[in-house]
Amino acid sequence: MAHVLQKPKHSGTHSIVQEFQVPDYVPWQQSKQETKPSTLPPVQQANSLHTSKMKTLTRVQPVFHFKPTTVVTSCQPKNPRELHRRRKLDPGKMHAKIWLMKTSLRSGRAALRELRSRENFLSKLNRELIETIQEMENSTTLHVRALLQQQDTLATIIDILEYSNKKRLQQLKSELQEWEEKKKCKMSYLEQQAEQLNAKIEKTQEEVNFLSTYMDHEYSIKSVQISTLMRQLQQVKDSQQDELDDLGEMRRKVLESLSDKIQKKKKKILSSVVAETQRPYEEALLQKMWESQDFLKCMQRFREIIDQFEENMPVLRAEVEELQAQTREPREVIFEDVLLRRPKCTPDMDVILNIPVEEPLPF
């Protein structure tokens, strides 16, 4: 915790002047006095927001340099006449004393003003330090509370994890015991299978021994018989394949003839059905057919007329545009000699002045 600077009490101008009358060093040692280091211990920073502020506060430490004021006190006589006589006798000394007193008063006032400014600065610095310390304490309290809450949460989580781990360990132990029992059963079953396989291997070994003797004596005769039977079987397959090809060709031809007959019967039946269904509506159908033919002829004629009109359209458009350019108001046509409508004169047109010339009289 930093030491809080106490605000000094004002006891008037007289007490301040008395304090400055007794300097703790001689005047010529004033320039040689070294700046005292800060007596405030560094404040531990709670967060990064107060870093620059605290550095400034700990770095700025005011150093008071007061010019000592000397008040010349002389033995004042008790008799006013004697005092009046002395003043009359030494006016130069009196002026010097007055000037010295005025100078001391001015320096005292300047020192008082400086002291007040220093006091204001120190009080402001004190308030800022108090606010900073309070903010640091608040932030530290919040941080400690958050850490305590986090510790409580972590303790709860650790308890839950320990309980779940114990429960999981018991479950794994029971599963391991079951797995060991299953493995024992499986091992006994595998041992039985191994015994059975050993018996089969012995039996197979006996068969192999028998086959080895068979291969040495009867295999050559049996192989010749098998090759002859394979050739006979291949010949039978070839003959059967030829017969199957002939049979497939015959089947295809029979199916084609049957399909042709079926199609002819279908067409005949459909034509008879169509004729029977169209018989009551034959006249109307003929009429519709003739009307459709006439309609097609009319459409063809109309298409030819439309094509002809489309060919004549550009010529007619040109004629209409020409007529529109030639049309004028009836007023201008009737009163042409009165209105005297002439074309406008543009800047690039040649101006022709048609001024009538006075002809000389014949007499």
UniProtKB/Swiss-Prot annotation:
Entry coiled-coil feature ranges: 109-329
Record InterPro entries: DUF4618 (IPR029236)
Keywords: Coiled coil
Protein's recorded name: Uncharacterized protein C20orf96
Organismal lineage: Eukaryota, Metazoa, Chordata, Craniata, Vertebrata
